[in-house]
A protein has these predicted regions:
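A generic "structured core" feature
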Residues: 25, 104-107, 163
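Asp-based, Mg2+/Mn2+-dependent phosphohydrolase catalytic module
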Residues: 1-14, 111-232
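Active-site neighborhood of HAD-like aspartate-dependent phosphohydrolases
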Residues: 1-53
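Alpha-helical elements of Rossmann-like donor-binding domains used by nucleotide-donor carbohydrate transfer enzymes
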Residues: 29-33, 69, 73, 112, ...
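Charged, low-complexity surface patches
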Residues: 63-64, 106, 125, 181
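A metal-dependent, Asp-based hydrolase signature
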Residues: 52-95, 116
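Surface-exposed cleft-lining segments at the edges of enzyme active sites
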Residues: 95-104
Length: 232
């Protein structure tokens, strides 16, 4: 039997980028890449915004081939072929950034907290808008997971309901018994809440200190020791 300060939860799932590691660390390590490929990265940012917006406006419809659509949108932005856009994206970002993540460290105590949660009986999951394996073992967290999903492969980025429902299905746990942890109010928290999951928002320390239960999430925390204390 799981004993938790948050009643009714049986599984805890995490976003990765900005949630398990500070987003600024990736920015720091990719500055040279951004400068060298600024046109492509600006186009990619616009395309992801379009795809996120689509997921928000039509949260129950998946794209039949997400990657083809993404490549076509990129091709339009850059005036190149979809194949060229897709090849660059796959080689330089999806695969090419793997080595950058080797130099990035996770938030302190993140892995240790997840080990404790796993030991307490919780199912552990990951749901990310990028492939979890892009981060290798996700700093040793991936082997602890019962489920690790990439929303792109499911045809819809967050905050679409689809990836969150697929997460619940893969965990074999009803949405109301899942706590989802993320750093984006718009994508992580809104998407998880829309299917009935409980939500935890990793926030700026001052925000977390002054407002432990913000209106947009069930709990807010600024470090993983604090998060563990809220749950166990």
């Amino acid at each position: 039997m799981i004993v938790s300060k948050i009643s009714g939860i049986e599984a805890i799932a995490f976003d990765i980028d900005g949630t398990l590691y500070p987003a600024w660390k990736l920015i720091l390590h990719t500055i040279p890449f951004f400068i060298l490929h600024i046109r492509f990265m600006n186009a990619f940012r616009k395309v992801r915004h379009i795809l996120h917006r689509r997921s928000s406006s039509d949260p129950d419809t998946a794209l039949p081939d997400f990657f083809n659509v993404q490549n076509e949108l990129l091709a339009t932005q850059l005036n190149i072929s979809p194949q060229e856009a897709g090849n660059f994206l796959d080689k330089e970002i999806y695969k090419g950034w793997k080595k950058k993540f080797l130099r990035i460290r996770p938030y302190p105590f993140a892995k240790e907290a997840i080990i404790r949660l796993k030991g307490a009986g919780f199912k552990i999951g990951i749901l990310s808008d990028f492939p979890p394996e892009q981060k290798g073992s996700v700093w040793g967290i991936l082997p602890l997971c019962d489920v690790a999903l990439n929303s792109e492969a499911l045809g819809a980025l967050k905050p679409s309901r689809i990836p969150f429902l697929k997460l619940a299905e893969a965990l074999n746990t009803s949405c109301v018994r899942i706590l989802y942890v993320g750093n984006s109010k718009t994508y992580d928290i809104a998407g998880a809440a829309a299917v009935g999951m409980k939500t935890a928002y990793i926030a700026n320390p001052l925000v977390s200190f002054f407002r432990k239960k913000p209106p947009y999430a069930d709990i807010s925390f600024s470090n993983y020791r604090q998060f563990l204390n809220y749950v166990l």
